[in-house]
Amino acid sequence: MQGILSIQSHVAYGHAGNSSAVFPMQRMGFEVWPIHTVQFSNHTQYQEGWTGRAFSADDISELVRGLNNIGALEKCQAVLTGYQGSAEQCLAVEETVTKVKQANPDALYVCDPVMGAPDKGCIVAPGIAENLLNRLMPMADVIVPNQFELSQFAEMEIHTLDDAIIACQRALAKGPKVVLVKHLYCLSDESFNMLLATQEGTYLAKRPHFEFAKAPVGAGDLISAIFTAGLLKGWTPKQAFQHCHDACYGVLNATYQAGEWELQTIAAQQEFVEPSKHFPLEEVTLKTVE
């Protein structure tokens, strides 16, 4: 039985981390083997707080050993990683990706390098950003950073579309074959912008921006998951990006229309199979937009 190994956070209530990523990939036809880096009652933006705990790096490695014992790693089509709770967890992920690639050289590694955002800066524990930037992102086939995380990896500030394109080119030169910028903040507050870059070209995706009273949590995890599933379907990065962008819009639209804070992943599940709205991609090059 082939599958996707997804190593990231988990919440019992709502949709963030694996709780946001696992079902969409299953709905798109893939078996998913989730390993949780933390397990919380709910996401951490609730003013009432949350309960739960982080797992150790040894917890992750132990589960991977068990999967290896039953021959699962050679059937692993992709490793998807998101939020890591410690520097040690990052090292366990690095070891896991290496083992999976040894067992199945065709397996993809998709790294969502959760570090922070422009308005918050780096929000992860000491050592995590360094391991993401120096170990996990360079070994990944695909990285899915936001603008802040891309700027950290490319070691440059991003203020314009040209900056973003150059940063993606720098990122591609460091090892990844595909860069999907899950949120490009610098262009406009009127639209939500994403960017895809490969050696073959760079594409900009724009969709309407929703004025949520409180921004939903877990949308980035959703983006990474749908894109991963699209690539495993044999779609080109551009095709997977198009589907991912349209499907995520559908989920966010359903969430907005329902007046909910938590992503309406279950109610909007048809979006993962057949998105209800299409937003054409724009191929961009340097100096396309000043």
UniProtKB/Swiss-Prot annotation:
Gene3D superfamilies hit by this protein: 3.40.1190.20
Class in the EC hierarchy, top level: transferase
Named cofactor requirement(s): Mg(2+)
Similarity comment text for this entry: Belongs to the pyridoxine kinase family. PdxY subfamily.
Protein name as annotated: Pyridoxal kinase PdxY
One family name in Pfam for this protein: Phos_pyr_kin
Classification via HAMAP family: PdxY
Example of a GO MF term: pyridoxal kinase activity
